[in-house]
């Protein structure tokens, strides 16, 4: 059982949905990013997705791309991202952390070394958006052997023929991308999401978390209500980009988590 598994078990026992938030490590700078990260659990965040800055983030919309570029411009690296996790873990040993990014920085470091460092830093799971199931031997299988969850993405174009491959080695939760396209797109509609989540859940016991396009407390409540929870990224990152005080960013996150937890 990982921290992710424990979190879903606890939420399920209390009849609550999960609220997952995404921030980019090192955006707009290390200290501010860490301050936001440290405040997320008190703002109601159940699981933290921490973005690993990368030079070619092909699956991300402009909001996340710019956040990654700001982080890179500020000198953020994989080593510093792992250090941020260690700094967070010094005060929080319970909130799950999922590192989300692309395979190149991991490959460059070496898979075995990366997995050892990630586990020791306190990372619980990985989302690597450019590694399909056909390449599970690259990272997915070794990651799970190292005790990390490997979280896969599914989209509206993941049909019944493709779904078993997507689910085959997924653990922790499945991230359902509610809209085809890049991050930060238009708001998802519960009427569209509900049957897709039901279709996925008929094939797996893994929790299904829905993301992309959620910007309000009401949207968080509505979407979490037809899944096991929801994830918000671009809406939070946008506020960080605008230079909002950390307290205001966290107040916004609290409004979103309140919505999800009211589902």
UniProtKB/Swiss-Prot annotation:
Q: Spell out the InterPro entries in the cross-references.
A: Aldolase_TIM, RibuloseP-bd_barrel, Trp_synthase_alpha_AS, Trp_synthase_suA
Q: What is this protein called?
A: Tryptophan synthase alpha chain
Tell me yes or no: is Lyase among this UniProt entry's keywords. yes
Classification from the root reads:
Bacteria, Pseudomonadati, Pseudomonadota, Alphaproteobacteria, Rhodobacterales
Question: What Enzyme Commission number does this protein have?
Answer: 4.2.1.20
Key words, A-Z: Amino-acid biosynthesis, Aromatic amino acid biosynthesis, Lyase, Tryptophan biosynthesis
Q: Where is the active site?
A: 49, 60
**So, what pathway does this thing act in?**
Amino-acid biosynthesis; L-tryptophan biosynthesis; L-tryptophan from chorismate: step 5/5
State the GO CC annotations: cytosol
Oligomer status and interactors? Tetramer of two alpha and two beta chains.
